[in-house]
């Protein structure tokens, strides 16, 4: 499904179902050097079980045109305009990694227009090492190899991931390379990492939220370790917000490495 947002064409995957304005909407946001496809299993399920799904390609990524966001705040502005273009009075936001920060920032701004915010593989601050930032800028293919080495806890997928024999590590590397090559004007890897590294409004955003929160965290995540989300969790609980925390025994790609557990967490959360 295509929308015109900020003067450019924006692609959203709908899970193979037509958009129904009578249903609630879940808006999925991917991370650095990814696209809508990282949510394929969870988004398609929700689309066939009572939800509208908009799994967006952020500007400059995948099938979406426009300049890629240089900050979390810019991406949150884009989400607000996407909701306006789609005619959404309300939506649930579900974000992974960089996308989780975008979801958090957007929810803090849009307040009652956001019914739920699910943060998958999140951290605050989401620091990126100097070595990885340098590799992302000067040797992006080397950086992609580094990312995937630290992101994954499994080489073979569970049975529910797209079928037996799926190579989750290789598929992730191929996606990263395709998204990188798809935008010759901007280095999407370095730009996204800088946006993560510089975002400083995590705790302030928690203070401004009005919706319930879900954290889905990988127990062996080396990119955004469990402990790196604790500040957000504690801040939200101290404010008396509704907070659910689900940990799964995988790394940074919860959606592919633990698809059923991640979906179960989302289903339970969205039903509240």
State where each predicted segment sits.
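Conserved alpha/beta-hydrolase "acid-adjacent" motif
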Residues: 222-228
